[in-house]
Design a protein with these regions (language model features):
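Extended, compositionally biased flexible segments
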Residues: 2-93, 97, 256, 262, ...
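Short hydrophobic-aromatic micro-motifs
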Residues: 6, 47-50, 101-105, 123-126, ...
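Catalytic-pocket segment enriched in acidic/His residues
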Residues: 19, 57, 133-294
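A generic local secondary-structure boundary/capping motif
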Residues: 37-39, 60-62, 86-95, 109-116, ...
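Residue-level recognition of short, solvent-exposed, well-ordered loop/turn junctions
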Residues: 49, 96-98, 205, 222-223
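Short catalytic-site patches enriched in acidic/histidine residues
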Residues: 70-87, 110, 151-157, 216-219
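Short, conserved beta-strand element in jelly-roll/cupin
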Residues: 72, 102-107, 155, 195-196
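RNA pseudouridine synthases
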Residues: 98-128
């Protein structure tokens, strides 16, 4: 296996290879990892993510996996890097981490078999599919603002080639405390299946990335929290939560705190209980209403 990273060095983008605690450029320059300014390890034209894949996640929501994977799209502007700041806007409070393994496409592919999918994968990285659930009442179907806001797709620190994804652990930590833990053997659809499935109808280009799903226990984070995702053989992706500007109030849907929002953010069973997005005319907060009656 080898690990390739992209860093900013002397105001230029450099592709470097990792050797222990050092990163080495093609012309022989060396940089300590701790001093490197990391960029995302690839330059995708598409960021695609699966909704559900781990058995623990479906059990947490008291739901069942669909018969086949379902996906959503994250804008390129959501892309972030190792040690990058993840922004939670003012007036928002339900920003969740979701530690994941990321597939990086190496060659253009379309309409390929599962057996051939590995030929089109450049390697693997670590991702954190952050979700701003304050907008779930508005964009639950498309996930556009829930998962697509700027900075909500950290990937890194590097791209590892020839990594065997079978029976590997994945863990997420917040401020050093373990929050998520699972194993790739508990994924319903493996990496090769996901690539072949998407490529049936969508051309995948070099650098494109696919988030492969998160296990149970995705939870909200607070300003100042440090979130780390660790994957066996891939390393550790680190990000800090910072506060952004306030969401404009004179235009568009506003952050909400409905029971669906809170239940999703806290790993609840809103779908099992038949709760649906509240009226788009009122966007009532059933959580607030319930608290007012207590």
């Amino acid at each position: 296996m080898s690990e390739i990273r992209r860093i900013l060095l002397d105001d230029k983008v450099e592709v470097v290879e990792r050797f222990g605690d050092l990163l080495k450029t093609e012309d022989g320059r060396k940089v300590l990892i701790e001093n490197a300014v990391h960029l995302p390890p690839c330059e995708p034209t598409k960021i695609i993510a699966i909704h559900l894949n781990y058995d623990s996640r479906t059990k947490e929501f008291l739901t069942k996996l669909p018969l086949a994977p379902t996906y959503f799209h994250k804008p390129i502007t959501a892309l972030n890097s190792h040690n990058g700041d993840v922004v939670r806007p003012k007036r928002c409070k339900w920003l969740n981490y979701e530690g994941e393994i990321v597939i990086v496409i190496g060659k253009t592919c379309k309409d390929i078999s599962i057996a051939d999918a590995h030929k089109y994968i450049a390697g693997y990285s670590i991702g954190n599919d952050f979700g701003l659930h304050d907008f779930r009442d508005t964009d639950a179907g498309s996930m556009l603002r829930v998962k697509g806001a700027d900075s909500l797709a950290p990937v890194g620190p590097g791209l590892v080639t020839d990594w065997d994804f079978h029976n590997k652990f994945i863990r997420t930590y917040v401020n050093g405390v373990l929050k998520q833990e699972d194993n790739t053997k508990n994924m319903e659809w493996d990496m090769h299946y996901l690539v072949a499935d998407i490529a049936r109808t969508i051309t995948l280009s070099p650098g494109d990335i696919i988030f492969s799903g998160t296990p149970a226990n995705s939870r909200p984070v607070n300003i100042g929290d440090v979130v780390e995702v660790e994957v066996e053989g891939l390393g550790r992706l680190t990000n800090r939560i910072v506060e952004g500007h306030s969401i404009r109030e004179e235009v568009g849907a506003q952050p909400t705190e409905s029971e669906e929002v809170v239940s999703t953010a806290l790993g609840g069973d809103w779908e099992f209980r038949g709760i649906r997005t509240p009226s788009k005319d009122l966007y009532p907060s059933t959580v607030k209403e319930r608290n007012d009656h207590n």
